[in-house]
């Protein structure tokens, strides 16, 4: 599945709707207000994000001055025990900095159609996420 702004939006909206992610509304607000700085072209569906400086936009995480992953979720996908991993990154101010979307640990390109097996097999939410 080729990476595009439309695909980035679909993955972002998918995560925002997940019950496991407590900051879904903030994720959508951040995505709508900022802009994608770079789409990865390696075969994954990741992007680097440039957030809005508008202080009215809700943050994903409490500002701690550090860039890092604030949410991770891993799904089995399809019958071949493949996995799809999502990692949400925040900058030191707590704003969206990017989203990594990998298939099989980024060993293979993202296929055109992915069927997720529920429930996710791994979920990690940073204590810094604003719920």
Task: List each language-model region with its residue ranges.
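Short, compact, well-ordered microdomains
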Residues: 77-125
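N-terminal domain-onset segments
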Residues: 1-74, 110-131
